[in-house]
Amino acid sequence: MEVDIQSKKILLKEKVDQIIFWIKKKVLSAKKNGVIFGLSGGLDSAVIAALCQKAFPDNTMALILPCESTNDDINDAMSIVKKYHLSYKNIDLTPIYHQLLSIMDTTFNNRMAKANIKPRLRMIALYYFASIFGYLVVGTGNKSEISVGYFTKYGDGGVDILPLGNILKSEVIEIAQFLEIPQNIISKPPSGGLWENQTDEEEMGFSYKQLDNFLKNGEITDKKTEKLILTMSQSSVHKRNRPPAFKFKK
């Protein structure tokens, strides 16, 4: 048992080292100075914080961008800032979010349309500071959520690089444990923070465990869930691809 645990730690260290090297390579090849990312207080952004700090100890910036966010999420984000000694800015986007809604046509009252403004405002803030400091914007999305389009187009999907983009949620959890991310952050229900008490799994209609099993094996025993996963994946292809461009026939 001890040998298995030690072997797993060695494997995880190799994975972490590969990701850190990849981040460095992407930033240097883009001729940028460092990295910037949004720190929500969730698991994925905590892992990204740890990886980025290891890649660029002196040129990493975290943006805490609450927008109707809970105090717990803000406190969790701050705990990561302190743990990894991150350079950061805490900018409350709630007032500008409400101001924007007040001048829009709100007669439709579409909750999702309103909620998606939040990650898009965060994207604007990230690229503003990225431009000032010459940093790349690092996304926090993982393979599981990307595969079913569980992200906001031109919001949290609007980034320069995705270190976790080919890593399943279950694998991100293992990396988080190896990096000694606080257990309360690892165990809290994943949430995009789009509205009060919103969780990823409730909104998707299935668990990350089911989704990861499907992505690993190509099928799961629960065919209703399998169909839902396939439907979400197919309907979100446009979110994962560049916009199609018209071509004249030759």
Model-based region annotation:
Residues M1-V35, L51-K54, D58-M61, E68-S69, ...:
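ATP/NTP-dependent adenylation/nucleotidyl-transfer catalytic domains that generate, transfer
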